[in-house]
Amino acid sequence: MLRGANAINLDTKGRIAIPTRYRDWLGDTCQGQFVCTIDIQSPCLLIYPLNEWLLIETKLRALSSTNPQERRLQRLILGYATESELDKSGRALIAPTLRQHAKLQKKVMLVGQLNKFELWDEDMWNQQIKNDLEDGLPTGIELSSGLREFSL
């Protein structure tokens, strides 16, 4: 499973070095292959191990190409989806269009989200975490069924 926030660097060629603690798992799970795409709700990228991405593709394929909202979702997620794999040094290339979309600079955050990573520009990540902590969970609104039953 992918968890934890890791401060890493984007090199001049647009590569990130995946932290060592994830490399064996990624090698065993997906032979180091993954798909990177945009997050449609946050200014970050989503990096899915290939096996997890195939599940996402199945869900996207099931959407209607005649429904404008579903078509828009397919267009954005699939249109930006880029396959890649870890090199022998455990580095992964992030496509220029994806780097531009997420406004990635040299310092980035690789954040495990169980079945995928989020890749953030470090300053944007810090601002997002600050906002999340300040906002907390809203009161006076109806929580989703998942949040009603969620506990730590």
UniProtKB/Swiss-Prot annotation:
Record PROSITE patterns: SPOVT_ABRB
GO-annotated cellular components: cytoplasm; nucleoid
Main location (coarse class): cytoplasm
A single MF term (Gene Ontology): transcription cis-regulatory region binding
Keywords, ordered alphabetically: Cytoplasm, DNA-binding, Repeat, Transcription, Transcription regulation
Compartments in which it is found: Cytoplasm, Nucleoid
One Pfam family from the record: MraZ
GO biological process: negative regulation of DNA-templated transcription initiation
SpoVT-AbrB domain ranges (all copies): 5-52, 81-124
Subunit structure: Forms oligomers.
Protein family per UniProt: Belongs to the MraZ family.
Family matches, as HAMAP family: MraZ (MF_01008)
Protein name in the entry: Transcriptional regulator MraZ
Protein's organism: Psychromonas ingrahamii (strain DSM 17664 / CCUG 51855 / 37)
